[in-house]
Amino acid sequence: MNGIKKNVIIVAGIFLLAMGICALIAKAIYTRKTLGELTFEPDYYWAEEKADTDKWDFRKTYAGYDYFLYIPPEYKNDRHNESLKVPLFVLFHGSENKGISLGRYGRMFTDKKIQSIRSCAVLVLLARCGYYSDCHDTSMLIQNVIIQNECIDKKNIVAFGHSQGAYYAVKLACYEPRLFKAVISGSGYYQITHRELLKVLPIQFWFGLSKNDKGIYEQGCTTGPLLEKFCKNSVYAEYENRGHFWVELDDVAPGSGRVFLEWLDKVLKEA
């Protein structure tokens, strides 16, 4: 009897040890590594053309990228204060749609519905041609925008994309998992590999598709469920008849009932 009891204790101990090891592994793979020292690159830092308004700062960089940057008014004259920890949205437009990016997406993320959650900076990044392609270049640009605006929190960057921009936002997250805390994808069609999925487990995704978005849905419909199932606090929002859409502020995910702004509130305020 004592032998049986001893064996039971040993088995229980091994089980608890295994559970503890599994918990430590799970914690490790779901803990996001963030950008360390940022990389200064003069072609991405310096601008050959500038134009500032009360709301937006425009820059044309020597690297060939144009962008608009919004810094909340209360921080605009204190942009070198690193202690402010201002979150940043990086917005990626659809293919050949850079002409409408500022008015459509820039306006959405400077809306009080977003800014009342937390005062956030907004970077509207225009593709060098009609679409985005080079992940290294984009990472360098974002890093150099942060170097110039030290009030931005490099640990709290959220990507937003529509169509090809949504595809690219997920692609960029897979390329450099330390860059984004979360990714918002509307009508994106990136087909994630299992190896990439392991890299982005700590990143939070809101991934939206519509079944009647022919050609897009078929490509992206495997990625969304994988992200929701395995990635931290992630949502797959699948619609029946929404067409080729971008994620909007009042969105609610069918099925789960998750509310976009509530999800975003949690993302932005989480340490």
Q: Which residues does each PLM region occupy?
A:
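Short, proline-enriched alpha-helix->beta-strand connector loops that line the catalytic pocket
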Residues: R118, K199-F205
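Active-site machinery of serine-nucleophile hydrolases
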Residues: V86-L88, F92-T138
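Gly/Ser-rich "nucleophile elbow"/oxyanion-hole loop immediately N-terminal to the catalytic nucleophile
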Residues: Y75-K76, H80-L84, Y131-S163
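A domain-start/cap signature at the N-terminus of enzymes
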Residues: N7-G13, M19-P87, P225, C231-S234, ...
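Primarily recognizes the serine-hydrolase "nucleophile elbow" in alpha/beta-hydrolase
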Residues: K155-V200
